[in-house]
């Protein structure tokens, strides 16, 4: 099953829950969490640790100078 199929199924399951405000808020939170996880699984996306990357990808610095400072630039590679 592809990620797009999973996303479409999640939308179809969560849409009926959006009949009340609290259910809608809950559905949106679940959907946004799913989208965040799907986004992190794409190589080259930013990350903070290996847990943000899927499969065999690891969170690595783009270049040595970018690893220094408060906001190091890291990508799933």
Swiss-Prot record:
Keywords: Cleavage on pair of basic residues, Disulfide bond, Secreted, Signal, Toxin. Contains 4 disulfide bonds. Residues 1-21 form the signal peptide. One of its GO terms (molecular function) is toxin activity. GO terms for cellular component: extracellular region. Residues 22-40 form a propeptide. Expressed by the venom duct. Its main location: secreted. It is found in: Secreted. The cysteine framework is XV (C-C-CC-C-C-C-C). This is Teretoxin Tsu15.4. The lineage of its organism: Eukaryota, Metazoa, Spiralia, Lophotrochozoa, Mollusca.
């Amino acid at each position: 099953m592809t990620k797009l199929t999973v996303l479409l199924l999640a939308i179809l399951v969560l849409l009926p829950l959006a009949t009340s405000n609290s259910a809608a808020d809950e559905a949106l939170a679940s959907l946004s969490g799913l989208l965040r996880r799907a986004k992190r699984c794409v190589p080259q996306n930013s990350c903070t640790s290996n847990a943000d990357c899927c499969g065999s990808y690891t969170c690595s610095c783009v270049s040595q100078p970018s690893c220094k400072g408060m906001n190091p630039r890291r990508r799933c590679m």
